[in-house]
A protein has these predicted regions:
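Alpha/beta enzyme core
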Residues: 1-104, 108, 114-123
Length: 123
């Protein structure tokens, strides 16, 4: 009813400790089942990779490519690389690694601005 073309999923893959507490369970399976139940398969799911305002000590041994492969495996339609917190720009190397790992769309998320986009988008 909202007319949305996509949703952004913060906890699609892997656990994290966030400002709102422990996010122990990734939501990929639950979200995909709910999308199907609603008959909303046309609504794309964009997965946040390394949610902002979070500690990723639980997944510190995973590089950005591993996050991308997991999101692909769990059928994300696209991915978002964000800064570590609001107004902190995404890391250009992580953005480049994500894009080199997948053919799916990868967006620069939180922290990307018109002023810094040209710099962080450099491959």
């Amino acid at each position: 009813a909202a007319g949305a073309s996509f949703v952004r999923a913060e906890g699609f893959v892997f656990a994290a400790v966030a400002d709102e507490g422990l996010l122990a369970n990734a939501c990929a399976g639950e979200l995909l089942r709910e999308r199907k139940r609603l008959g909303a398969e046309s609504i794309k799911i964009y997965a946040d990779l390394r949610k902002k305002h979070s500690s990723h000590a639980l997944t510190a041994d995973l590089d950005m490519a591993a996050w991308v492969r997991a999101a692909e495996f769990f059928q994300a339609d696209g991915m978002i690389v964000t800064g570590t917190e609001t107004a902190v720009e995404p890391d250009s190397a992580e953005l480049a690694m994500a894009r080199a790992t997948t053919k799916l769309p990868v967006l620069a998320g939180s922290g990307a601005t018109p002023e810094n986009l040209a710099r962080i988008e450099v491959p």
